[in-house]
């Protein structure tokens, strides 16, 4: 996967389309969130693990927004960054608390691992995130 990313990145840089890398990664994250919120999450029978995984995306979204700053010379990136910042407002409405000793940080792969977390996310906030992801995905895929 890393080789494919590097090959695409190199090709786009050589052709002067560096910002496309940012848009590809952003689109992949939006699609993954859409799948999680539309296929994995069942509002009639909510699964705590699925809710936790959706909620933990607040950290990934923060990283994505930071990554997209590299491509602010592209107005399309700026446009979607504003949309993602709006989405981040929903994620900022709750906290996630990890138990001491339960959180493992893999600096090499840049991931957090935890067997569980306490969070303050409400059903209303979750529904707002789900709705906005659906709207954003529709805009990206059917402009």
Task: Give names to the regions the model predicted.
Residues 1-81:
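Extended amphipathic alpha-helical interaction segments
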Residues 67, 71-143:
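A cross-kingdom marker for long, charged
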């Amino acid at each position: 996967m890393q080789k494919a990313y590097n090959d695409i990145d190199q090709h786009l840089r050589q052709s002067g389309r560096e910002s496309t890398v940012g848009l590809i990664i952003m689109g992949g994250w939006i699609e993954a969130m859409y799948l999680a919120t539309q296929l994995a999450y069942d509002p009639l029978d909510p699964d705590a693990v699925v809710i936790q995984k959706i909620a933990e995306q607040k950290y990934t979204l923060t990283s994505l927004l930071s990554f997209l700053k590299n491509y602010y010379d592209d107005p399309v990136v700026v446009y979607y960054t504003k949309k993602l910042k709006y989405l981040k407002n929903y994620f900022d409405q709750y906290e996630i608390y990890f138990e001491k000793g339960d959180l493992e940080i893999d600096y090499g792969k840049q991931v957090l691992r935890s067997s569980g977390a306490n969070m303050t996310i409400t059903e209303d906030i979750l529904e707002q995130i789900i709705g906005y992801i659906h709207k954003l995905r529709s805009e990206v895929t059917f402009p």
